[in-house]
């Protein structure tokens, strides 16, 4: 297994205008992340990949393409979580066969699952695949809030490496790192990387790293070295960029910026807005020229 610490891009997926996967474009996005953004790894099949709007077959295709293009150049994490446990297991087996370094799974959502049910979900995926697991905690979208003791129950399984922590509860983050220092934490909010690194996270997984990965690494390494003031200046610039991206449409804007960099990033998957308006295109161009 490769080192899973450091900067991981939450991989975008290029779609054609009809919603089908644009394989050439996806390969270009993978290459751009590795060759230009110099990332340590890719988190494939997450929210940024518009995963929850895709069929099982499409998810598998994305895992295959990303692995073929990345080869063994960087670490690869496959997000296989689903409200359908059978699908999660099927995807987990497939990604494991492809050679992904670890699986990750979002907490089951929509229905109000008990913690016992959530624990069973993770235990089942691990038992059926034999691969490592990274819990994907994103409470503001799933409604699932777990405390230190509940994470501890999940961590009792030696295959659970840690958590992708996409939450603003930094008290919980600090308590987790203190209670379980040997378990990894990846920061999930790009705009709060500096305080997260100050609290001891081991890496970060972010959507904006597809275009802002070099700055993300600077923040991470400066903060780790105790150069907080320098890291803060870069975080300020990063957050100005993120503010502009969010106001213009997150995934769509990142894709348009990539296109301006010569990457065939394609369209978004409906029911998201698939194609940028002239105004959105102008904003993307302005952000690229100002920040990248």
Swiss-Prot record:
One of its GO terms (molecular function) is N-acetylneuraminate lyase activity. Its EC number is 4.1.3.3. This is N-acetylneuraminate lyase. CDD domains: NAL (cd00954). The gene is nanA. Homotetramer. One of its GO terms (cellular component) is cytosol. It holds the Pfam family DHDPS.
